[in-house]
């Protein structure tokens, strides 16, 4: 298995402990983590990304236990092997689309996918030289996906990627994420409260607060 999440729990100071369902994924497989606002979905995603350390349990990505890594080693591992699609695109508005992707590769010290080839796959190669600040919401979302994929990660995490999209575009974004994950052999985890996309992913786990 490429990704394993086992017996994970986490507690914020003064709050009840949150427990999360176990699951595992091979390369090219996807899971939808579905839950209402406040259920702990984003906490679960942050644990899978190594942005939080679990109170109990562990996340193993390609044989590496994330909680065993710290500081620069963890940052470098995350940059090289985990791609994150945030709910609101984390892009530098003053840079061009291509420059945003090149910056992601530079910071991770990893030569991944060709930015132009990736933009072609996502249907926005014509925007490669455009400043990110001039893009539409849908275009910016695709660039955010491209940025998450540019280092050819082993794990793709998508946090509420369809929350601001209409039905048609929500479906397309999930299909796009699945297709790209399958193409590079990455595990895909989509965290959402959006019931509309439930039918797009075969493996669905409910995340419920205590």
Descriptions of predicted regions:
Residues 65, 112-127:
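Conserved ABC ATPase "signature" region
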Residues 57-65:
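Conserved ABC transporter NBD signature motif
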Residues 66-83:
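ABC ATPase NBD coupling module
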Residues 131-135, 139-141:
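Conserved ABC ATPase signature
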Residues 49:
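Helix-to-loop junction immediately C-terminal to a conserved catalytic motif
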Residues 156-159:
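Catalytic Walker B motif of ABC-type/P-loop ATPase nucleotide-binding domains
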Residues 152:
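Conserved catalytic motifs of ABC-family nucleotide-binding domains
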């Amino acid at each position: 298995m490429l990704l394993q999440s086992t017996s994970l729990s986490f507690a914020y100071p003064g709050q009840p402990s949150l427990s999360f369902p176990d699951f595992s994924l091979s390369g090219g497989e996807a899971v939808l983590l579905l839950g209402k606002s406040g259920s702990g979905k984003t906490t679960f995603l942050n644990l899978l990304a190594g942005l939080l350390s679990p109170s109990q349990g562990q996340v193993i990505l390609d044989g590496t236990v994330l909680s065993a890594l710290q500081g620069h080693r963890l940052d470098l591992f995350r940059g090289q092997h985990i791609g994150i699609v945030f709910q609101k695109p984390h892009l530098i508005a003053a840079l061009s689309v291509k420059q945003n992707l090149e910056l992601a590769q530079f910071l991770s010290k990893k030569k991944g996918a060709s930015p132009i080839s990736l933009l072609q796959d996502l249907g926005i190669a014509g925007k490669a030289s455009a400043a990110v600040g001039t893009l539409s919401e849908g275009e910016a979302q695709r660039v955010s996906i491209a940025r998450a994929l540019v280092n050819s990660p082993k794990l793709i995490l998508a946090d509420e990627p369809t929350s601001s999209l209409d039905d048609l575009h929500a479906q397309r974004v999930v299909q796009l994420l699945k297709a790209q994950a399958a193409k590079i052999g990455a595990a895909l985890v989509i965290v959402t409260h959006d019931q509309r996309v439930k039918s797009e992913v075969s493996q669905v786990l409910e995340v419920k607060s205590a």
